[in-house]
Each structure stands twice: as C-alpha cells, then as structure tokens.
C-alpha cells in the first residue's frame, strides 16, 4: 500500500448510520486477493491485471501537497441526521473532482460489467449509501444507466404506513362519547394521561450526551403552544427571506454569497456594556496596560493567530462579515473562500473596535464608580448633618442641665425641698447627662449639708423613725438604675456619702449620751435604720459607737453589788457584734465572774442562774474550762459530804451537784461521779447484800439511782462499767440462795469473812446461766423460748411464761409486753412472776 493511500480506522457518521445496514457498499476484492487472502501483495509492482483497474482509479486522485500549511481537522463525533448542502468550490477543485468521479465511475462500471451481477447500493435512491434525498437527481443525471439497478426490499419498507399522517383517528371522539372531559385525566380518579408520551428523536447514533444535554420525555398536549406558534412564524419568515433572495445559479441553482446583498450588524452601547460585564471578556485596565505590548501567538484554533496582547485572548476569531451570522457555514466548520483578504487591515480594524469597546466599558465603569461615590458622599453628608443636629441638641441640653446645677451650688439660701425639686428635675428630664457626668455625686457636697442642718433638732434615741421617709426618698433617687450604674465612682457611692455626712453626726451625738445598761433605745434605733444604712456604715456604727460603750459598761460592772444582770444588756448584742464581743467584752466578764465565785458555795443556787445564759454565748471550750476551774472543785467537796444510806437517803447534797449537769459536759460529770460517788456507792451495795436483804428492795434502790442519771451520762463508759459491776454483784448474791435447789446436797456453810468485794466472787458453776434458767423453767412447766428477730442491747430476748427477758451476763433483765422498761430481777422472782405476768 502506498504512502498516500492508507486506511483510516476512526468511526465516522457513515459508520454509525450504516451500522445495521446489510446492503451497505463495500470494496470489491480482486481475484488475486480472493485467492491469497491476507497474504496477497498490494504493491503496484506485483499487482496483476485483476486489480489494476481500481488502482488506476486511485492513482488518478490528486496527491497531497505537503508544502501547504497544516489544517486542523475537527475531532469528536460529527453531528449526524442533518441534511448536507453543497458548498461553493473553486473551478479547479470542480474539475479535479469531476475527473476523479469519472474515473471511479468507469472503474465501477467495468467491475459491474465484468462480474455480470447487479451492483447493490450504487444508484439506488432508496439505499442508505446515498447522502440525502436532494442529491439523488443530480447523481442519477451524472451516472449512465447502463448498469443494472436493483432495489433492496428493505428500502421499500421505509414508506410503509406513511399514508396515516394524512388521516385523522377517531380515538378522541370515542373518549368524548364515553364521558371524557378535555383537559382532565383518564380513569376513575383521573390519574391517567390522555395524550401519549412524546419521545424526542436524537440527532444520531452516538453515545448518550454526545450531542449535548438529553431532552426529557414529555406528555403530549401539555406543551406551550405559544412557543410552537412562535417557531412556525419564525420559520415562515426565514423561508420567505430565502425565497426572495433565491436566484438561479449556474451550477447548483443557488447564487454565491458574494453576489447576495450584504448584511450589516450593529452593536448598541448596552450590548457592549453587557459584554464587558461578562467574566473573562476583558482584563482590568492596569493589567491591560502592563500586558498591552506583549506579542501573543494563539495556536489553540485551526490556524495560528498572532495577537497584539493578552487582552485579545478573550475575543473571538475574526470572521468575514458574510459568514458572521451564517449558521449553516458555522455548522459545517468551514467558511467560503475569501476573495479579498487583508489581515493587517482586518487586525487594525478589529483593534480599533476593541479599543472603542474598552473605552465604552471604561466610561461605563467610571460612571458607575462616580455614581456610587456620589451616593456614598450624599449618605455621609446626611449622617454628618444628623450628627451636627444631635450635637446641637446635646449642647442645648448640657446648657440647661448646667444652669440647674449652678442653681444648686451657687444659691446660699437654698432649702432642702428646693434642692430636692432641682435634683429630681435633673434626674428625670436630663437622665442621660445625670448618669454620664455623675451628677449624683453632688449629694455629698450639696445635699448632705442641707440634710445635716435639717436633722439638728432630731433626737434619735427618743424618736428613731422621724426622718425615715425623707431618707427613703433620697435613696430612691440616688440608687435607681442598673447595678452597673450604681458602682461607686469615688471612695463612697452617692447614697453612702449622703448618709455618712448628713445622718452620722446625729448618731454620734446620741451614742455619746447612751447608757449601755439601757439597751432598748439603741436597739430600736438600729432596727429601724438597718434596712436604710449601707452595710459598711452599719458596721461602723456598731464597732465605733456601740462596742466602745459596751466595753466601758462592763468595766464599771460589779457582779456582787450590781442589781441589773449583765446578760440582760450584753447578750442582746451577741447576734450583731459576735466576734467583736468575744475579743473585747467576754474575757472581762469571765474574769469578774471567776473572782466572784471564789467565795461561792454550791448551796447558793444564784451562781447557776447567773452562768446559764452564757452557755451559748461563750465558746464551748472556754465555758468548760471556766466550770472546771471555778465550779467543779466546789462540787467535789459537796459529793464528799454526801451520805449514802439505803434506809434513809437524803438527796439535798446530790441535787446541789446534779443540777450542774446541764452546764457541765457529760464526760467531765462522769469523771466527777467516778472519782467521788461510785466507789462509796458500790461499797454500800456490797455491805447491804452481805446482810441477807430483800433483793426486790435492792433492785428498786438500784433502779432509782439509775433513773436519776441522764441518758448522755449513762452512755459514758465509766458509768456503764460501774452499773454493770453492781448488777453482777447482785446476781452472784442471788445465786447463793438458789444453790441448794440446784444440787441435792447443800454446800457446807461459809465462815464469816470481812466485807471485801473480791471475796464475793464465786467459782463458775458447771452450767451456764441460760441453761440454768431453761432447766428451772422446764422443771416448773414454764415456757422458755427465744423470740425471732427480737434483741435488746444486742442480746436475744426470751419468752418466759407471760414475761419477756434477756440475759446480760448473769443478770435477768425483765419487761412486760411494751419492751421499753427493763429492770433486773433475781431468778426466783422471775420464776414467780412469769406465771402471773405481774412485775
């Protein structure tokens, strides 16, 4: 195969149109190619006479000229389905094409004549090989009618049913007869469509999206009829224009474009401005000046373009005026040959047009900027006028408020009601200036002297509530507003300064004449003024006016000769002064009370009455230390004088000691009883048990002493231990009487021994005490069973007949059904009372 003759493998529109056409024309193989197949030689030297006829036709084609410039070929898939029109060509190209066509025609006719078979798809007007319906008459005139024409049976099927487009169906008529209403849907719920779905024919057989965005299917009858009417009008107008311009041509029946009338297209200023507003059309003015002298070569199009600068990149390629708006020439991708072409003149004209457009766009931009700047300046001017007017109003307001302030300051005969009226005008009518300039601070320098002069005749201790309405009125004026506005500007806020400079002088004069022992007047004064006084002012009154007077009164107080109790005029200040009294007053009181208690005796009950009010005032440690130092030694001596006699007990001394248990801590009271009471009490109990007494009487004596002790004291370990030992001694003493009933032979009599508590301890019995009680109950037929879930002091409770008891070591604690009152009893007494249920 020669260099100029090669086979292309790209897919063209012809391949897509004849993809499924079995009668498409194909190249005929020579005899040599049929024999040797792929091993056949296609070179011109070795080709025989069989293939010479075709090669002669191919050799007659015009060879390619490689000296000509490179022409770019448009890539992609060509738009198929459109009718192609003949383009105007030069005379030499017509001659060469005519010669090539005659050679090809002669070759095909020879092959057809040699084969003796009809040639399919050559001159058949219904064959798919023909390009369009308009070209068929021309081709038929050029080709001779010597060859046999064979029509394909497939081509005849194209016009089957074409007559239906001239008829009218009766489907709509039948629907109207069945009750169909035009414009509504079909079916019971009118959900069906009455028009078929309109399908849009694609331009070719390429892939989806190859011809632009796909058109969605629509329902017939719902399209906008006005659009179709406009299209029909436009097509009719175009057809009329073409008909008027039609003139019979020499070759194809159409007049060349050069002979037709020229059309001129004008751009308005609005179009140029709108084009300039599009992004990327023109570069900015600064960038255009910088890049204006740069030579740019554009090779992105079919041919090379030399541009004067980067600003020309966004402009379209220069096209002749004749084909500027020719849609058909644009679709073909080629323009008619230019007879008169002057690139330099065209470039200069285009440059002038571009410069003119740029000037128009620049003027428009400048006009827009000036308009925006003018609007901004007008807006700023209006704002400045408003600011000037506001400042004038502000100055006038300041002058008016200044005039009232000068009347407050410069008037020596100003009274408090007049000052109040001016002050209220400033607060109400000039509130912004009042808060901005802190006019409330005038209260300390202007209002306070007037208030002090107003309160000269006021007696605070006699009439504490007289000036309260006036002070409440000034507090409302000086403390109104938000919390942020009430923050003090100086050391004191305005209201505190007014109270300190106007009211405190009257408080100081009244406190100097106040007697501390007469506390109600001062207490009433502070109770009435406490809600109105600032916290720091109230603290100052208590610390600087009240506390010094209390300290002076305590120094003058004598507990032995003074008839007024000190707690009546000192303790009322405890809730207010608190720690201040503990530091300055209470130590002096304790010191004087201790001196007075040196000669005190417990039979004098006034000491306890004098100390009881101070129990909650003094700290707990200080109070207990004071009692241990001055009271407990006196109580120890009294307990030493107490005589414990079970037969005739005198409890006077015991009451003198026991009445202090509310003041003395239980721990210290337990230590006092452990050292000075319980040893002698245990000794008396042991002596009494050695004299064969009545154990019921001993039990009552034990219960009586225990009931006199308080619950906190009974929980002390030392007291509990003494009571436990007493119970154990009582139980062991009762066991000596029950010993003969347990064993058949009584033990030998014990010789008398000195009364010593250790001698009363017997060796342990062979049985446990619980087993002994159970055995005795079984012998007498008495029920002895534990109660599930019942415990007292951690001990199991048992049912013994009609009574309930629990065993604490070797002592029986008995109670009735209340389970509240428990008392110790002997085993014999338990067995006797268990049958009757009476303790």
Curated annotation (Swiss-Prot):
Domain of life (superkingdom): Eukaryota
Chain ranges of the G-patch domain: 167-213
Residue positions where Phosphoserine is found in the record: 43, 47
Polar residues composition-biased segments: 140-149
Region Disordered, annotated ranges: 22-164
Phosphothreonine modifications at: 53
GO cellular component, one term: precatalytic spliceosome
Pfam families xref list: G-patch (PF01585), GCFC (PF07842), TIP_N (PF12457)
Molecular-function GO terms, alphabetical: nucleic acid binding
Main subcellular localisation: nucleus
Segments forming a coiled coil: 363-411
Biological process per Gene Ontology, one example term: spliceosomal complex disassembly
Subcellular location: Nucleus
Biased composition (Basic and acidic residues): 88-101
Keywords: Coiled coil, mRNA processing, mRNA splicing, Nucleus, Phosphoprotein, Spliceosome
Biased composition (Acidic residues): 102-111
Family per similarity comment: Belongs to the TFP11/STIP family.
Role played: May be involved in pre-mRNA splicing.
Assembly behavior: Identified in the spliceosome C complex. Interacts with pnut.
Protein name per its UniProtKB record: Septin-interacting protein 1
